[in-house]
């Protein structure tokens, strides 16, 4: 309980005090740098997956045709 009280008092001080401007500016700069980084990480994974699927599609089509040919020979 004392920990929560200390946290509330310290956050209230940072909101009111003039010295806290540098603290909040640093937090804002860090957040503004992290948000695009996280967004790019998720978007690049989906692009890579699409590229991989496009690269292997012709190979899979040839494999399917070969498997169908072998199955027709067995029947």
Swiss-Prot record:
Functional description taken from the UniProt entry: Amphipathic peptide with probable antimicrobial activity. May act by disrupting the integrity of the bacterial cell membrane.
Domain of life: Eukaryota
TM region(s), chain numbering: none
Assigned GO CC terms: extracellular region; membrane; other organism cell membrane
Keywords: Antimicrobial, Cleavage on pair of basic residues, Membrane, Secreted, Signal, Target cell membrane, Target membrane
Propeptide positions: 51-75
Disulfide-linked positions: none
Stated name of the protein: OcyC3
Entry similarity comment: Belongs to the non-disulfide-bridged peptide (NDBP) superfamily. Medium-length antimicrobial peptide (group 3) family.
Tissue expression remark: Expressed by the venom gland.
Signal peptide coordinates: 1-22
Localization per Swiss-Prot or TrEMBL: Secreted; Target cell membrane
